[in-house]
């Protein structure tokens, strides 16, 4: 699967990876917190992680793991699912913490979905990752991505037939011709040492630090595109405004 993913990403665009992981964190409980800009950015993140000798697992919406064929592949690859509103959410969190302490790097998207901010800056997100970090003692490495949005349209809310797949296929084929830069930056670990699990307000404070670190790493990746992406995706709805958007 790793070889197939690397080949797919290499066909899709030009992978550019910056930053690295401190050697003393290898094998330690590690959370990778990334912005979410495209249906393809998980594949880009996997390929980038292999460049720095990491093999992370993703925390995904539980429904994905129940999709025929796709779900089986994801489960066999070690990815984890969580249904936030279901009774198994606590058990899923236990599995995540166990994987972290077994030395498995875990990727979580704090936003929980592809950003719909008009400028494609990170959305507000939720505190789940921050709570896991504080509760498990895991280190948090912010990951910033840019360019994968040019490789695949946002597409449709639901796919009920082959016509619904056309936006994904046509945008990807254009990407193969255009070869956009697929940029991934691994930032410095976020310092959460003064915060405590269960202390009122600390999960929110941790979340804010993580999101600001992701955004800080994103700024140089999208130099020349500070307001809105130069690439226009006609299928992506835009709502709200990112609270993390740089003001200067």
Please identify what each model-predicted range represents.
Residues 13, 63, 86-90, 122-123:
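A conditional alpha-helix N-cap/helix-loop micro-motif detector
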Residues 4-8, 73, 162:
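Hydrophobic alpha-helical segments of integral membrane proteins
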Residues 4-36:
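Helix-to-loop junction immediately C-terminal to a conserved catalytic motif
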Residues 13, 54-56, 77, 104, ...:
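A structural micro-motif
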Residues 24-86:
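Catalytic core of membrane glycerolipid acyltransferases/transacylases, capturing the structured
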Residues 90-248:
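Non-catalytic C-terminal accessory region of glycerolipid acyltransferases
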Residues 5, 76-83, 112-116:
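Short, basic, glycine/proline-bearing loop/turn elements
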């Amino acid at each position: 699967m790793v070889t197939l993913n690397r080949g797919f990403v290499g066909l899709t665009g030009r992978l550019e990876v910056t930053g690295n992981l401190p050697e003393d964190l290898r094998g330690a409980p590690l959370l990778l917190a990334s912005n979410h800009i495209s249906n393809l950015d998980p594949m880009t993140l996997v390929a980038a992680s292999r460049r720095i000798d990491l093999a992370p697992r993703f925390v995904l919406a539980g429904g994905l793991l129940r999709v025929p064929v796709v779900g089986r592949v994801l489960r066999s690859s070690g990815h984890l699912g969580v249904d936030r509103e279901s009774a198994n959410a606590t058990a899923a969190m236990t599995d995540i913490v166990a994987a972290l302490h077994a030395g498995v790097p875990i990727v979580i998207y704090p936003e929980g979905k592809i950003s719909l901010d008009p400028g494609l800056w990170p959305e507000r997100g939720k505190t789940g990752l921050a709570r896991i970090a504080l509760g498990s003692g895991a280190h948090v490495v912010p990951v910033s991505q840019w360019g994968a949005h040019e490789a695949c349209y946002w597409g449709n809310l639901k796919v009920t037939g082959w016509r619904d797949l056309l936006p994904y296929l046509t945008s990807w084929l254009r990407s193969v011709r255009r070869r956009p830069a697929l940029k991934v930056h691994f930032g410095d670990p976020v310092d959460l040492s003064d915060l405590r699990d269960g202390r009122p307000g600390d999960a929110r404070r941790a979340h804010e630090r993580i999101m600001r670190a992701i955004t800080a790493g994103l700024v140089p990746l999208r130099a020349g595109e500070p307001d809105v992406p130069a690439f226009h995706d006609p299928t992506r709805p835009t709502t709200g405004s990112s609270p993390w958007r740089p003001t200067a």
